[in-house]
Amino acid sequence: MFKVVAFVPVKDADKVRLAIGDAGAGVLGNYHHASFSTRGIGRFTPSKGAHPTIGEIDKPQEIEEERIEVICQKDKIKATVTAIKSAHPYEEVPLEIYELVDSVL
C-alpha cells in the first residue's frame, strides 16, 4: 500500500482529485474517491527555459495550493501519476509517493 501526495493550485484541486479517484486511487474498503486535503502556500521561481503556467521567469511566485493525499495500491500508482499529470496545470508536477508500513510497529 502506498500514499500518493500531489500539490495543486486550489482552483484545480477538484479536477485533480476526481482524476486521482477515477484512476483507482483513494479506495478504502467499500469507499472510493477518498482523499484528505490541507491548504498551504506553494513557492517557486521559474528559471530560464521554464514555461510557467503561473508567474514569470526569475520572479518569485506564491500561490495557494492544496496538498491532496490518497491511499493507492501498487498496481494503481502508474495510472494515478499519469492521471495527476494529465489533470494538473503545472509544467513540473509536485508529487510524493510513500510506501506505507503494513503492520503496527
Annotate each PLM feature.
Residues 1-105:
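Hydrophobic structural segments
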